[in-house]
């Protein structure tokens, strides 16, 4: 396929794509160009770029992450890790910068990872977190908030399927319905990586 392929739901190119695919989901055997969508997948070869929430290929490592920290103490996520780039989709509970009632969050992070020594790597990512405050809502705390976050991570892979990591970062928690920050501060996290 040469040129531009646009669809509302999915694009499928069984052979080589030379150009651009734009849809919610994109698939091509070989890509010479750009895939833009929520989920992008190529099977054999990429000479170009994928721009989406999840970018995958046969070599993508799909890893489960379990972690906690000073902002949300209980989190679980799925990381789609390629050679250099990765994305993380996660959920967490008990957002700590509210009162003590139940709250939950959903997050998306995208970043770069660099190996520095046998099993040791550093990475950095930018993220967005949606926070549902549930019963915490009052005159000061709205029903929903969002956070913009930056993190630096240090990860050590103990075995091929098990690793540990520590994270430091900074986040701004903001209102959806008005300008200004609800809160801001440091992020400290640690956890494990499976698979």
Predicted segments, located by residue:
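Residues on the lipid-exposed face of transmembrane beta-strands in outer-membrane beta-barrel proteins
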Residues: 24, 38, 53, 74-80, ...
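Repeated loop/turn-to-beta-strand initiation elements of outer-membrane beta-barrel proteins
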Residues: 16-18, 32-34, 46, 83-87, ...
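Long amphipathic alpha-helical protein-interaction segments
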Residues: 44, 48-49, 53-82
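Long, low-hydrophobicity, solvent-exposed regions enriched in small/turn-prone and acidic residues
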Residues: 1-4, 18-19, 33, 103-118, ...
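Residues that define the transmembrane beta-barrel architecture of outer-membrane proteins
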Residues: 18, 30-32, 47, 68-74, ...
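Repetitive, compositionally biased segments used for assembly/scaffolding
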Residues: 1-60
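Outer membrane beta-barrel transmembrane domains
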Residues: 125-149, 153
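Sequence/structural signature of outer-membrane beta-barrel proteins
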Residues: 11-13, 27, 41, 58-60, ...
